[in-house]
């Protein structure tokens, strides 16, 4: 990644490899679940490998596959090799639900890793629960997503956490007394971060503007912002629009810090913004390649670089972590229900 880009402020120093899953509330399945096969353990991948947010899904697929390869090379789980059934949900919520049904009823997987986004995860979980198969999303951040869902696990922080961290960072580190809030109004993810930011920020929000996913021309809103007195722009949203916003803002001479959530994460954001304009940018990341990491995280970094000849994003790291969580929970398990129970006990 080009170093002109002011890399992430890291809310968590590094991904906690083999960390605990997200909170699990009430709710249950009447299904017995899928049995673990005699010679293999089937795990389904349900990732956004094409479509609007393919950068997230393809990164997660790579991280997840790396974990599978390492586990299998080390002898598998209880001597059984992991068999991956990899499906593309095309960045569509309906397809994520359909893929889940296929994985649990046709492929008979014992666990699912993915989707990446909150919307797709919310669409997928009902079909997984009905079949008694646990689903872990490496990166779904929507608050309350696990409420009432015994079969859903989350591998990252929530939107409300991100909004508070952004507020703290712009106030304490950037000394921003006045900000502009520019939110993707079509995204529950973005709206969740914006809501938490508004509640936590003690300074003045001098403008509260919105855009919609798929927009490409942001000059009208940016022109309005340019006439304001502010110290930073907060952009809750995904890289697909945020990168273009950075590009156009810098092209108009707006050089104030631009701050976002984990949706900025990845090389694709820099490609959208262009390297020469992607400066003075800050975003949250659960993993960073530029800070000191643990021995386990370094082993992941080295292996990922060797396999793919590129830097891993936080999405790759979280998916790698998620597969290890599933593998650990599958030890000694006879069916998907027992894998779910073991995931729920993970600390």
Describe each model-derived feature in a short phrase:
Residues 249-320:
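Extracellular/periplasmic periplasmic-binding protein-like sensory domains
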Residues 103-116, 136-138, 178-183, 229-239, ...:
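Periplasmic-binding protein-like
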Residues 118-129, 220, 232-252:
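Hydrophobic alpha-helical
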Residues 1-42, 73:
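Short, low-complexity disordered leader/linker segments with a strong preference
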Residues 35-63, 87-94, 116-117, 182-191, ...:
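Extracytoplasmic "Venus flytrap"
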Residues 152-213, 232, 326:
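An alpha-beta-alpha
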Residues 307-316, 327-347:
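Segments of small-molecule ligand-sensing domains
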Residues 28-31, 56-62, 74-146, 211-215, ...:
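Beta-alpha junction/loop-to-helix N-cap segments that form part of ligand/metal-binding clefts
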